[in-house]
Amino acid sequence: MRKVIICSPRGFCAGVIRAVQTVERALEKWGAPIYVKHEIVHNRHVVDKLRAKGAIFIEDLQEVPCNSRVIYSAHGVPPSVREEAKERGLITIDATCGLVTKIHSAVKMYARRGYLIILIGKRKHVEVIGICGEAPDKITVVENIAEVEALTFSTKDLLFYVTQTTLSMDDSADMIAALKARYPQIITLPSSSICYATQNRQSALRNILPKVEFVYVIGDPKSSNSNQLKAVAARRGVVARLVNNPEEITDEILQYSGNIGVTAGASTPEDVVQACLTKLQKLIPTLVVETDLFVEEDTIFQLPKELQ
C-alpha cells in the first residue's frame, strides 16, 4: 500500500514561534502599525497574515517614522542598524533568534581577542549580513570549498569559524573538514553553529529517505533551511520538490509509484502542510498517511521582556 510519510519534527521551530508571536503580541498591545525590519521569517504565508493585521515590513529604517516601534526579524541585524534606530528615537523590540544572537556574541568576543573569523554561509543572506556587521574588518565569508581553498591565512594566525544557522549539515561538514585540514589551529564554538531545529529537520528527512521515492519540501523559495532540506534529499538521489502551497503540487506525482515523503521548513505553518497533504490525498485517494517521529522538540524561547 502506497504511503505518504510525514517527517516529525517539521515546520515552525522555537525561534520562529517566538518571532511570529512577538509581532502578534506587539500588534495586540500597541495596535497597528508595527514596523518590522525585514520579513519576520522567510515565509510568504506568515508575512501576508501579519501584514493583514497591521505589520509593515521594511528594509530601510528611514521608512519608519520617528518614535515608532520597530521589531528586528528572527535573522538579526548588524550593530549599525541598532545605532541608527537609537539615533532616530525608534522604540525597538528584538525578535532575533537566540541561536543567532549566540553567534553574534561569539564573533564579537573572538574579534576582540584578536582572532580572524571565517563565516560559512551565504554572503547575501540577511543573517550573514547581520553577523558580519559585528566585526566587518575581521570576517571572511566562504560559501563553498573552492572559497575555502582560496583563503590566504597563515597557519600561525588566530582563526575562529562559525556557520550560518540554517545551512545543510552535509555541505557545512565538508567545508569545516577543508578548513581544519588547511588550518589545524582553527577553533569554533563548543556546539555546532547550525541550529538544533535545522539539524533535527535534516536528520528526520534523512531517516525516511530510504523508504521513499519522492519528497515534497513545503516551504518558501526564500527560506534557506527549506532549500537545504531539498538539497539533503537530492544529494541522496531522491527526487525532491520545494512547494509553498497546495497549488504547486501537480499530477507530476502520478508518474511515480513509490512512497512519498513530506517535510517542511522551520518557517512553514502547519496549516499549509495540512493543505498540501489534502491535495496529495485528492490526487491519490488510496494514500496511507504515516508520521515518522525522529525526535521530540521541547525548546521554548521566551518573548522579549517588553511583551511578557
Curated annotation (Swiss-Prot):
GO biological process: dimethylallyl diphosphate biosynthetic process; isopentenyl diphosphate biosynthetic process, methylerythritol 4-phosphate pathway; terpenoid biosynthetic process
Record: residues binding [4Fe-4S] cluster: C13, C97, C195
Cofactor note: Binds 1 [4Fe-4S] cluster per subunit.
GO molecular function: 4 iron, 4 sulfur cluster binding; 4-hydroxy-3-methylbut-2-enyl diphosphate reductase activity; metal ion binding
Binding site for dimethylallyl diphosphate: H42, H75, H125, S223, S224, N225, S267
Binding site for isopentenyl diphosphate: H42, H75, H125, S223, S224, N225, S267
Gene3D superfamilies: 3.40.50.11270, 4-hydroxy-3-methylbut-2-enyl diphosphate reductase, catalytic domain
Cofactor: [4Fe-4S] cluster
Alphabetized InterPro entries for the sequence: LytB/IspH
EC number: 1.17.7.4
Record key words, sorted: 4Fe-4S, Iron, Iron-sulfur, Isoprene biosynthesis, Metal-binding, Oxidoreductase
Catalytic residues as annotated in Swiss-Prot or TrEMBL: E127 (proton donor)
Record flagged with keyword Ribonucleoprotein: no
Entry binding sites for (2E)-4-hydroxy-3-methylbut-2-enyl diphosphate: H42, H75, H125, T165, S223, S224, N225, S267
Entry's family note: Belongs to the IspH family.
Biological function: Catalyzes the conversion of 1-hydroxy-2-methyl-2-(E)-butenyl 4-diphosphate (HMBPP) into a mixture of isopentenyl diphosphate (IPP) and dimethylallyl diphosphate (DMAPP). Acts in the terminal step of the DOXP/MEP pathway for isoprenoid precursor biosynthesis.
Protein name per its UniProtKB record: 4-hydroxy-3-methylbut-2-enyl diphosphate reductase
Annotated organism of origin: Chlamydia muridarum (strain MoPn / Nigg)
